[in-house]
Amino acid sequence: MTHQAHAYHMVDPSPWPLTGAVAALLMTSGLAVWFHFHSTTLMALGTVLLLLTMYQWWRDIIREGTFQGHHTPPVQKGLRYGMILFITSEVFFFLGFFWAFYHASLAPTPELGGCWPPTGITTLDPFEVPLLNTAVLLASGVTVTWAHHSIMEGERKQAIHSLTLTILLGFYFTFLQGLEYYDAPFTIADGVYGSTFFVATGFHGLHVIIGSTFLAVCLLRQIRYHFTSEHHFGFEAAAWYWHFVDVVWLFLYISIYWWGS
């Protein structure tokens, strides 16, 4: 191995960006094929390829950062900046949905009956399942912070327990959201109300699933002694992402469920 006189990580050539891009193409085009031709083959292929890419890319990063020592302080600083910029881009992504919602609701057109919610729409009670979901996500924010402090203090078992609890709360939120969708008195096809509701809450739900997966990988890594009290950026990034998902839900709850109903 050649001597490296700097602290930066010179990344080896990797096939995973290419396979990830192909998986994304197959999934998005597969979604369109599913909607129009009722065939899920292309989307299933994309999903399988995406899962394989995720597994192998994460495996490579864990090898480089945990076992080969490539994640030096300057590299970790770069990763932190990257995660902050990624979350900032996600903020603007959700800002688009809130903009669409408020554009439609603050000045409802005559086609909507000049009122919000539009004429004929029966809304969900914000003080039933949505309020429970809010409590579940806020509790998960507490447990993920507990996990973070446990890792920093070297309390391995506490970290495992609190992280497991966070993941279970995440899956419980997803389950409740699925029930709510199933029982909703309106659909995504019910005009601007249905589309803004399901697209905004649906993308948030997708982010909860992604965050739960992220935390599940961190749990496996914690069980296998990958984290130390000083070196655990993988978990830190997952915790930041989870807090972001929490905050987005609070805005969704106040805007769409409570004020919008």
Swiss-Prot record:
Residues exposed to the Mitochondrial matrix side: 1-15, 67-72, 153-155, 224-232
Pfam families in the record: COX3
Chief localization: mitochondrion
Cross-referenced InterPro entries: Cyt_c/ubiquinol_Oxase_su3, Cyt_c_oxase_su3_dom, Cyt_c_oxidase-like_su3, Cyt_c_oxidase_su3-like_sf, Cyt_c_oxidase_su3_a-hlx
Family: Belongs to the cytochrome c oxidase subunit 3 family.
Protein's recorded name: Cytochrome c oxidase subunit 3
A GO cellular-component term linked to this record: respiratory chain complex IV
Highest classification ranks of the organism: Eukaryota, Metazoa, Chordata, Craniata, Vertebrata
Intracellular or extracellular location(s): Mitochondrion inner membrane
PANTHER family linked to this entry: CYTOCHROME C OXIDASE SUBUNIT 3, CYTOCHROME C OXIDASE SUBUNIT III
Residues in the Mitochondrial intermembrane compartment per record: 35-40, 106-128, 184-190, 257-261
Keywords in alphabetical order: Membrane, Mitochondrion, Mitochondrion inner membrane, Translocase, Transmembrane, Transmembrane helix
SUPFAM superfamilies membership: Cytochrome c oxidase subunit III-like
Reactions that this protein is recorded to catalyse: 4 Fe(II)-[cytochrome c] + O2 + 8 H(+)(in) = 4 Fe(III)-[cytochrome c] + 2 H2O + 4 H(+)(out)
Gene3D superfamilies: 1.10.287.70, Cytochrome c oxidase, subunit III, four-helix bundle (1.20.120.80)
Presence of keyword Translocase: yes
Keyword Translocase found: yes
Function: Component of the cytochrome c oxidase, the last enzyme in the mitochondrial electron transport chain which drives oxidative phosphorylation. The respiratory chain contains 3 multisubunit complexes succinate dehydrogenase (complex II, CII), ubiquinol-cytochrome c oxidoreductase (cytochrome b-c1 complex, complex III, CIII) and cytochrome c oxidase (complex IV, CIV), that cooperate to transfer electrons derived from NADH and succinate to molecular oxygen, creating an electrochemical gradient over the inner membrane that drives transmembrane transport and the ATP synthase.
UniProt topology in membrane: Multi-pass membrane protein
This enzyme's EC code(s): 7.1.1.9
Organism: Gadus morhua (Atlantic cod)
Domain of life, per lineage: Eukaryota
